[in-house]
């Protein structure tokens, strides 16, 4: 789960990380009063969306008068902001964060992530802040600094000190950076975060460190322990189909293709999407119904797939272990009768009660295209659309 910048900064401040502050606007009628309350020389108007690249897309504006700040804020509120992370459809701006501007002497990048490949928490930092870290990693990888934390020992003083020295800090800035590293690590652990990113982390004209922008991504599996974090969720920033799927206990991610996929197991789902690409088409979604799905969940999964108007065909690929193939077959038939499936439907079943499942489908009277293996299924659905 992601949260907005202003929410991320509020959490960081609770842990002792110095951040820039401002006022949040959630409706146009509040804009003028918010700017009057701020009453500063330089205003920074920021669109609050769950996507990066706001600055380049016009979602961050710096102005030097109250009147101009009000105009910029009114113009920005409610627009559809398109960045390299939103895709061409963009994201509607329903919230603004308006801050006082500050003089920047130097910008840095700092983040803490869970590195799955190394099975540990890793700090990533760079002297090249204020830009996409992916761009820095691609063009000048030598400017990326990484420190991994052994989960058996946790964060040690040498980690924090090493980061401070590698970034070139001196004197009181070393102490400030060490405190930021320790505070961010504590926030990461205690909130069950998957990533905390501060970009940029700046040195202001007084020579002090300040988080100018912040991003949190939380591990969804840990959210049940944090109702206070769940309360920060903004469903307007989420795909409605993904939200609907999550409420039904389904793992669904919308994509840009035309072939809907319903699979049990994340690995099999990835393999199914790969083979669809291999046969020349593009998947419309990732959808894992899970091992314990019942007839109603299968029916809901197909309804969600068909809610995507770009779907021109559906491939169901089920390996029955805990999941029984006859239950899948009954769910498919129930969905077809309930909502009507007007696009080609290819079904590949294997495993527990597979023959019973195939019999149920063949006796249903529905136009279902059977497939005996994954390659056959991919070939048939691509040909059918």
From Swiss-Prot:
Leading EC class: ligase
Which SUPFAM superfamilies does UniProt cross-reference here? Answer: Glutathione synthetase ATP-binding domain-like, Succinyl-CoA synthetase domains
Q: Name one GO biological process term.
A: succinyl-CoA metabolic process
Q: Which reaction does it catalyse?
A: succinate + ATP + CoA = succinyl-CoA + ADP + phosphate; GTP + succinate + CoA = succinyl-CoA + GDP + phosphate
Listed under GO cellular component are:
cytosol; succinate-CoA ligase complex
Chain sites annotated for binding Mg(2+): 199, 213
Q: Where does substrate bind?
A: 264, 321-323
Cite the GO molecular-function annotations of the record. ATP binding; magnesium ion binding; succinate-CoA ligase (ADP-forming) activity; succinate-CoA ligase (GDP-forming) activity
**What Pfam families does the database record attribute to this sequence?**
ATP-grasp_2 (PF08442), Ligase_CoA (PF00549)
E.C. number(s) listed in UniProt? 6.2.1.5
The pathway to which it is assigned is: Carbohydrate metabolism; tricarboxylic acid cycle; succinate from succinyl-CoA (ligase route): step 1/1
Q: How is the cofactor bound?
A: Binds 1 Mg(2+) ion per subunit.
Q: Where is the ATP-grasp domain?
A: 9-244
**Keywords annotated in UniProt:** ATP-binding, Ligase, Magnesium, Metal-binding, Nucleotide-binding, Tricarboxylic acid cycle
Q: Which cofactor does it need?
A: Mg(2+)
Q: Where does ATP bind?
A: 46, 53-55, 99, 102, 107
Concerning PROSITE patterns, the annotation shows: ATP_GRASP, SUCCINYL_COA_LIG_3
Q: How does it assemble?
A: Heterotetramer of two alpha and two beta subunits.
Per the entry, what this protein does is: Succinyl-CoA synthetase functions in the citric acid cycle (TCA), coupling the hydrolysis of succinyl-CoA to the synthesis of either ATP or GTP and thus represents the only step of substrate-level phosphorylation in the TCA. The beta subunit provides nucleotide specificity of the enzyme and binds the substrate succinate, while the binding sites for coenzyme A and phosphate are found in the alpha subunit.
What HAMAP family would the database entry show?
Succ_CoA_beta (MF_00558)
- Annotated protein name in UniProt: Succinate--CoA ligase [ADP-forming] subunit beta
Question: Per the UniProt entry, what species is this protein from, by scientific name?
Answer: Rickettsia bellii (strain RML369-C)
């Amino acid at each position: 789960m992601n949260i907005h910048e202003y929410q991320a900064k509020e959490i960081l401040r609770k842990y002792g990380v110095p951040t820039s502050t401002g006022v949040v606007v959630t409706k146009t009628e509040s804009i003028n009063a918010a700017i009057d309350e701020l009453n500063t020389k330089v205003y920074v108007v920021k669109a609050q969306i769950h996507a990066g690249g706001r600055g380049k897309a016009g979602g961050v504006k710096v102005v030097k008068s109250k009147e101009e700040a009000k105009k910029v804020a009114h113009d920005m509120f409610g627009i559809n902001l398109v960045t390299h992370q939103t895709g061409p459809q963009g994201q509607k701006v329903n919230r603004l964060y308006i801050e006082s501007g500050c003089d920047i002497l130097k910008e840095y990048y700092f983040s803490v992530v869970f590195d799955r490949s190394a099975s540990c928490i890793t700090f990533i930092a760079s002297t090249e802040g204020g830009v996409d870290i992916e761009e820095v990693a691609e063009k000048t990888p030598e400017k990326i600094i990484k420190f991994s934390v052994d989960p058996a020992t946790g964060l040690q003083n040498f980690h924090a000190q090493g980061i401070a020295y590698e970034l070139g800090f001196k004197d009181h800035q070393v102490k400030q950076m060490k405190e930021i590293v320790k505070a961010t690590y504590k926030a990461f652990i205690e909130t069950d975060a998957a990533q905390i990113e501060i970009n940029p982390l700046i040195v202001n004209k007084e020579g002090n460190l300040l988080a100018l922008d912040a991003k949190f991504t939380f591990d969804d599996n840990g959210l049940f322990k944090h109702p206070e974090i769940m309360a920060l969720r903004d469903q307007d920033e989420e795909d409605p189909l993904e939200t609907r799927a999550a409420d039904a206990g389904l793992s669904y991610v919308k994509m840009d293709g035309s072939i809907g996929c319903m699979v049990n197991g994340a690995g099999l789902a990835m393999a199914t999407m790969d083979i669809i690409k291999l046969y020349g088409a593009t998947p419309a979604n990732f959808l894992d119904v899970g091992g314990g799905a019942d007839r109603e969940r299968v029916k809901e999964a197909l309804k969600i797939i068909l809610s995507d108007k770009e779907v021109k065909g559906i491939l169901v690929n089920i390996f029955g272990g805990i999941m029984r193939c006859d239950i899948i077959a009954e769910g498919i038939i129930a969905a077809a009768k309930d909502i009507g499936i007007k696009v080609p439907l290819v079904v590949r079943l294997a495993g527990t009660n597979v023959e019973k499942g195939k019999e149920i489908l063949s006796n249903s009277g529905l136009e279902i295209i059977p497939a005996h293996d994954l390659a056959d299924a991919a070939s048939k659905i691509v040909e059918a659309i």
